[in-house]
Amino acid sequence: MKKKSLLPLGLAIGLASLAASPLIQASTYTQTKYPIVLAHGMLGFDNILGVDYWFGIPSALRRDGAQVYVTEVSQLDTSEVRGEQLLQQVEEIVALSGQPKVNLIGHSHGGPTIRYVAAVRPDLIASATSVGAPHKGSDTADFLRQIPPGSAGEAVLSGLVNSLGALISFLSSGSTGTQNSLGSLESLNSEGAARFNAKYPQGIPTSACGEGAYKVNGVSYYSWSGSSPLTNFLDPSDAFLGASSLTFKNGTANDGLVGTCSSHLGMVIRDNYRMNHLDEVNQVFGLTSLFETSPVSVYRQHANRLKNASL
C-alpha cells in the first residue's frame, strides 16, 4: 500500500524534472541577435487572402526564436524607389524592436532592393542576404527589353503588367502606390544592373561567377539560389518558368528567371539548389522538389548561421 501511494508522487517529481530539462526547453535555433526583415521581389506582396509570399517561412523562423518582419514595397518600380520604401520600413522596425540593426533577406528584385538600403544606411543593417536575385541582370529582362522603347507593343505590355501589380497591391495588406513596370525592367536588365552596381558595388563579385566581399562597411553579405526551372510537375508555375528559362543564352544555368552567376552576392552559400525561382520562397503552396531539402529548412539554417555569427 505504501509503495502504491508513493507512485503519484514519483510521477509528479519525474514530470517536473522533465519540464526543467533543457531537452524540451524552447529551441533558440533561429534566434538571431537582430530581427530578420523579409523583402519580396517583383510582383510580390506580404500576404494575399491568407497566403504568404514567403510561404510558411516566417512562422518556421519565429518558432525557434527569430523576430521576423515581413515588408511590402512597390510591386513594380526601380531598385532605388523600392529601396527608399524599404528603408522607411526598416527605420520603423528598428524603432519598434528596440534593436539598432536588422538582418535583411531579399528575394528576386528584393535582392537589389536590400542592397540599396545596406549601401545608403549601413549603420542600420547587420547583414544583407539575397535569394535568387539578378544582381548582374536577367536574360529574361534582356529578352523583353528587345521590344522597341516607346512602341505600341511596349505600351500594351507595360499597361497589362502595371494592372497586375495594382491588383496585387489592392489584394495585399499594403498600399504601395503607383506601379512602374518599365522602371522594373530597366533595373533588372543587364545594362540597368550594371549602372546600379557602379553606384552600389558592395558585395558584388568582380569576376564573372565568383564571390563578392563578405563584409563591407560592417554589413555581412550572403546569397543563394536555385538552378532547376522544372522541379515538380504538380506545380502550375513550372510551365511558365520552364518557358522563361529558354530566354537564357548558351545553356546558362538558371532558376527560370535568374542566372546562377548573376545571383552571386558576398558569401555564396550555394547556387545549385534543385529549386526554381518560386521554389526559393516555397511557392507555389510548398510544391517543391521531392529530391531537395525544403526551402523552409534553408531559411532556418541561414538564421542559425546568422545567430552563430552574432548577427
From Swiss-Prot:
Binds 1 Ca(2+) ion per subunit. Keywords: Calcium, Disulfide bond, Hydrolase, Lipid degradation, Lipid metabolism, Metal-binding, Secreted, Signal. Ca(2+) binds at residues 235, 279, 283, 287. The active site is at residues 108, 255, 277. Its EC number is 3.1.1.3. Optimum temperature is 50 degrees Celsius. GO terms for biological process: lipid catabolic process; protein secretion by the type II secretion system; protein transport by the Sec complex. It catalyses: a triacylglycerol + H2O = a diacylglycerol + a fatty acid + H(+). Disulfide bonds join 209-261. InterPro entries: AB_hydrolase_1, AB_hydrolase_fold. Residues 1-26 form the signal peptide. Pfam families: Abhydrolase_1 (PF00561). Na(+) increases lipase activity. Inhibited by diethyl p-nitrophenyl phosphate and 3,4-dichloroisocoumarin (DCI). Changing residue 209 to S: Loss of lipase activity. Residues 35-280 form the AB hydrolase-1 domain. Substrate binds at residues 42, 109. The keyword Nucleus does not apply. GO terms for cellular component: extracellular region. Catalyzes the hydrolysis of triacylglycerol. It also exhibits some esterase activity with p-nitrophenyl acetate and Tween 80 as substrates, however the lipase activity is approximately eight times the esterase activity. It shows a marked specificity for the 1,3-oleyl residues of triolein. Belongs to the AB hydrolase superfamily. Pseudomonas lipase family. Monomer. This is Triacylglycerol lipase. The gene is lip.
